[in-house]
A protein has these predicted regions:
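A conserved mid-protein helix/loop that constitutes part of the nucleotide-sugar donor-binding site
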Residues: 13-24, 193, 197-219, 226, ...
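Conserved acidic donor-binding segment of nucleotide-sugar-dependent glycosyltransferases
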Residues: 307-308, 312-319, 328-334
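Carbohydrate-associated surface elements
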Residues: 145, 166
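A short, well-ordered alpha-helix in the C-terminal region of glycosyltransferases
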Residues: 321, 328, 335-350, 356-362
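Short hydrophobic beta-strand element within catalytic cores of glycosyltransferases
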Residues: 292-295, 305
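A short helix/loop element that forms part of the nucleotide-sugar donor recognition site in Leloir-type
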Residues: 47-48, 173-189, 359
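Aromatic "clamp/platform" in nucleotide-sugar-dependent glycosyltransferases that forms part
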Residues: 256, 275
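N-terminal strand-loop element at the rim of the active site
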Residues: 5-13, 17-68, 149, 153, ...
Length: 387
């Protein structure tokens, strides 16, 4: 079967890793092609990585506001690749991809990873996306939490599927101790424990709440350091908050790192303070690295983090509760390590790309009436995510 994956990539990040992970898992029986709108040339990093991994990849020449030309470009690619199914990733791919797919008679599937509402422009696009989703042939949601949001848009329930994000646990098999040394060098005085976080520095990620929580934690234990990887519009505001809180030596904004997965095994704890998520990739990555997690109970996070087993869940926006749970997790090294082990076991059982690919193949068969194989491993479905 020929599967085309359409997106609008601006860098090689979490959604792009998910796309290529699925491509690899489908490679034993299906052919995947990756397409991206150019985004001013910023799609180059993703397309280069796709080609490096052995997949055909191409940029869509035209883009908005030249909608007709962009739709014609995508339709031509679908015909040239003899596509059986189009997987659309993101609001631009959903809208333009559906129009192109209709033109050539190919089913279009939206992969709904979540809505951030990070600024006025994005909120407008996401509002259009919510209105438009009901016209897709199927909607894949990366968590049951996201599926609930999608159903509230008026999408027909029978068209909604939950297929969770997945993780390649083997990526975290070879730890490099030099990354721990690099982490320590971010701080003027090396801390005894490092609490890590990662994500775009934008309001919905809740890093201002993490700074407030860190102030409480460091007052109790000055040997704890916090480091956040990522860039974004809120960097200046966060820097001012950190300075005002007296955390200049204890809370570091480390910028974007493409090799974040090499640092993760050397966090003592990962925290996710977000106000909204689809299925947080960084939590899956932390668990794959054997690191415990303290997360807000938003989106798909409660479907991954077992409260009190592999980490802790707190209410979004509650800095005091976040600080208390971080302190509780760090209080016992033995419990901290056990939580990390429990998290790794969970992603090994529930969140593999092989299981994800089988669920997608079931969906493709439903859309095309093609035969599909069944497997004995756990399936990444709504049921498996919740237990």
């Amino acid at each position: 079967m020929n599967i085309v994956h359409l997106t609008a990539s601006t860098f090689y990040g979490g959604p792009e890793r998910q796309i290529l992970g699925l491509c690899r898992a489908l490679a034993d029986g299906d052919r995947s092609t990756v397409l991206s709108f150019s985004e001013g040339g910023r799609c180059a990093a993703f397309l280069a990585e796709a080609r490096r991994q052995g997949f055909e990849a191409a940029a869509v020449e035209h883009d908005t506001p030249r909608v007709r030309a962009a739709v014609a470009d995508v339709a031509a690619e679908l015909e040239r690749r003899r596509a059986d199914v189009l997987l659309c990733n993101g609001y631009k791919a959903n809208l333009l991809g559906r129009l192109a797919a209709r033109r050539v008679g190919v089913p279009a599937v939206a992969v709904s990873r979540g809505w951030t509402g990070e600024n006025v422009r994005v909120r407008l696009y996401e509002t259009i996306d919510r209105m438009h989703l009901r016209w897709m042939d199927r909607i894949v949601c990366v968590s049951e939490g996201q599926a609930r949001k999608v159903r509230r848009t008026g999408a027909r329930p029978e068209r909604v599927r939950v297929i969770c994000n997945a993780i390649d646990v083997e990526r975290f098999g070879d730890a490099d101790p030099t990354y721990r040394a690099t982490l320590l060098r971010y701080f003027p005085k090396p801390p005894r424990r490092i609490v890590g976080a990662a994500g775009r520095l934008s309001p919905e990620k809740g890093f201002d709440v993490l700074v407030a929580a860190a102030e409480r934690v460091v007052k109790r234990d000055p040997a704890v350091g916090f480091v956040v990887f990522g860039e974004g519009a809120c960097r200046g505001r966060l820097e001012r908050q950190i300075a005002k809180s007296g955390l200049g030596g204890s809370f570091r904004l480390a910028g974007f790192r493409s090799d974040l997965d090499r640092f993760l095994p050397y966090f003592d704890l990962l925290t996710l303070p977000s106000f909204t998520e689809g299925m947080p990739n960084v939590v899956l990555e932390a668990f794959a690295a054997g690191v415990a997690v303290v997360s807000t109970a938003v989106g798909g996070a409660p479907e991954v983090v077992e409260d009190g087993v592999s980490g802790f869940l707190v209410r979004a926006g509650d800095a005091a509760a976040l600080a208390d749970r971080i302190g509780e997790a760090l209080a016992s090294e033995e419990r901290l390590h056990d939580m990390g082990r429990q998290g790794r076991r969970r992603v090994e059982r529930r969140f593999t790309f092989a299981a994800q690919a089988r669920e997608y193949r079931r969906l493709f068969a439903e859309l095309t009436s093609a035969p599909v194989e069944t497997g004995k491993e756990d399936l990444v479905t709504a049921e498996s995510c919740e237990h």
